[in-house]
Amino acid sequence: NYEQCKLISKAARKAGKIVCVCHVLRYHPAFIKVKELVSSGRFGRIITITHTEDVGIDRTTHSYVRGVMNTEAGNNPMLLAKCCHDIDFITWLTDANCRRLSSFGGRVWFRRENAPEGSATRCCKCSVEQTCPYSAVDLYWRRRQWINNFDVPAGKTIEQVITQELEEGDYGRCVYHCDND
C-alpha cells in the first residue's frame, strides 16, 4: 500500500540506495512502433482499450494456488501483482490517465469441494494424477516447468529437490487441497 511504499522509500534513502519500478514494455521495439502509430493519429482517437492478461494455468497453479501468492494476506491484487506493466503501457500509449478499470476473477475453483473423487492431498500419492490437468508431478517432474524457483543446495541434484518438493513441499500439494483463499 501507499504507506508501505513510503517506508520502503525512506529506508532506501537512509541506506543510500535507489528503489525503482522498471516498466520495460515501453522500450521494446514492437511497443515503440505501436506507440508511434497511435501517436501519429493513423488509427484515429482511442476511445476504449480492452486488454486481457492470460496468466495461464501453469503459472496460476504454481504461484497463486500452491505458491507464495496463494493467500490474500500474503499477496497483492492480480492487477498489481501481474498487470502493473500492462497498465503502465496503456497509460503511456494513450498519454492519458485511466478513467475506469475493471478486473474479473477470483479464487473460486481450487477448493476441496471441487476436488475429483479419489484425489489425495499430494499429487505424488494421487490416484487421479495421471489424468489431472493440474498435476504437480507433470508440471515439475515430467515437463520440468517452473523449477527455476526451486533452490538446489550444494550436494543435491535438481531431481532430488523436485522429489522432495513433490513429497513434502508446498509445490507438491493438490491444487484442490491447498490453503489458498
State where each predicted segment sits.
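Beta-strand-loop-alpha-helix segment that lines the small-molecule cofactor/substrate pocket
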Residues: 1-26, 41
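Predominantly a Rossmann-like dinucleotide-binding segment in NAD(P)-dependent oxidoreductases
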Residues: 17-18, 25-171
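Glycine-enriched catalytic-core subsegment of oxygenase/oxidase enzymes
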Residues: 177-181
